[in-house]
Amino acid sequence: MSVIKMADLDLNGKRVLIREDLNVPVKAGKVTSDARIRAALPTIKLALEKGAKVMVMSHLGRPTEGEYDEEFSLAPVVNYLNDALEQTVRLEKDYLNGVELADNEVVVFENVRFNKGEKNNDEALSKQLAALCDVYVMDAFGTAHRAQASTHGVGLFADVACAGPLLSAELEALGKALDNPARPLVAIVGGSKVSTKLTVLDSLSKIVDQLVTGGGIANTFIAAAGYPVGKSLYEADLMDEANRLCAAAVANNGEIPVPTDVVVGNEFSDSAVATLKDVSEVTSDDMIFDIGPDTANKLAKIIANAGTVVWNGPVGVFEFDQFGNGTRAIAQAIANSNAFSIAGGGDTLAAIDKYGISDKISYISTGGGAFLEFLEGKKLPAVEMLESRAK
């Protein structure tokens, strides 16, 4: 994919508007998880090093559009940036009609969702944003799947529209994993429902060598294979779909392995007793909360032999330690593998943190919905816009 890259541009003295994803959790005016800000820092620093006048914009939370609401202010993010950049960073509330900027100054625009027309990609708002800058930088992979004024419209009207280093790295890593992967390509897709990830499963079943399912998704495949699932979360109306996906995988010389042993409990709680069972021995009162050690070992061997691993979602209720062994085993197998590995999605990142393997994953994606849509084979609107502006 051909886009202009910020790293290749002369930004000296230029007004540079960077769209980052600084949508971080805030409690009592303090940022409680800074991962997204840390991921954005190298881009902001690079723009400063290149002599730019830097403007940064982002959304935070879901305020009522067009209304200022202090609860969703980017003020805590600006306080964080003051320390991280070791310089004064200004929060600008009224910026649509122009902003005065000194060389090497950093200004953060207040929450873009306070602007009427942000979500529906309003043309007038997009043109106002574009008029503020010489160069627009889209660096927020996490919102690249949304065509909004700050992620898409502005780029259509700015003099120059380019991809920031973070977005460029995401696209390169995903391209490496999906467009021309080292084989075997193994995808691990967890989560509670087949319905929410059906298009992902459908798309991946056509290109992967092994598609591993986990969580509630796996329960639907277990039921479709004719095994009892008791009171487990599963989707009876999608069992035919599960069988179709299995057949599609086999037709493409791939496989969707069904667990042979599972760990069950009789209630969803951190005090539930974990019992290991053969997949054929699940009773009517059981709930499947994890894969068993035999299944985990088989999957670990598949991962050990992989050339590329794509991981989206845990394989069990890993928040409760007694149901976390399957996800831990998968995480360890990926960490020990020589494969190129890419992981994304909130629960996946929480598992990576819990088992301390972040430095062993080749690339950790900052995007949730955008990561999934890329896996589905969809074109991301922001990326399409950047490609069109590079022509």
UniProtKB/Swiss-Prot annotation:
EC number: 2.7.2.3
Recorded catalytic activity of this chain's protein: (2R)-3-phosphoglycerate + ATP = (2R)-3-phospho-glyceroyl phosphate + ADP
Keywords, comma-separated and alphabetical: ATP-binding, Cytoplasm, Glycolysis, Kinase, Nucleotide-binding, Transferase
Family: Belongs to the phosphoglycerate kinase family.
Source organism per UniProt: Pseudoalteromonas translucida (strain TAC 125)
GO annotation, cellular component aspect: cytosol
Entry keyword annotation includes Acetylation: no
Coiled-coil residue windows: none
GO molecular function, a single term: ADP binding
Complex and partners: Monomer.
Annotated localization: Cytoplasm
Identification of the protein by name: Phosphoglycerate kinase
Keyword flag Transferase: yes
InterPro entries to which the protein is assigned, alphabetical: Phosphoglycerate_kinase, Phosphoglycerate_kinase_CS, Phosphoglycerate_kinase_N, Phosphoglycerate_kinase_sf
Associated pathway: Carbohydrate degradation; glycolysis; pyruvate from D-glyceraldehyde 3-phosphate: step 2/5
Family annotation (Pfam families): PGK
GO biological process terms held by the UniProt record: gluconeogenesis; glycolytic process
Family annotation (Gene3D superfamilies): Phosphoglycerate kinase, N-terminal domain (3.40.50.1260)
PANTHER family: PHOSPHOGLYCERATE KINASE, PHOSPHOGLYCERATE KINASE 1, CHLOROPLASTIC-RELATED
PROSITE patterns to which the protein is assigned, alphabetical: PGLYCERATE_KINASE
Principal cellular location given in the protein's record: cytoplasm
Binding site for ATP: K197, E319, G345, G346, D347, T348
Residue numbers binding substrate: D21, L22, N23, R36, H59, L60, G61, R62, R113, R146
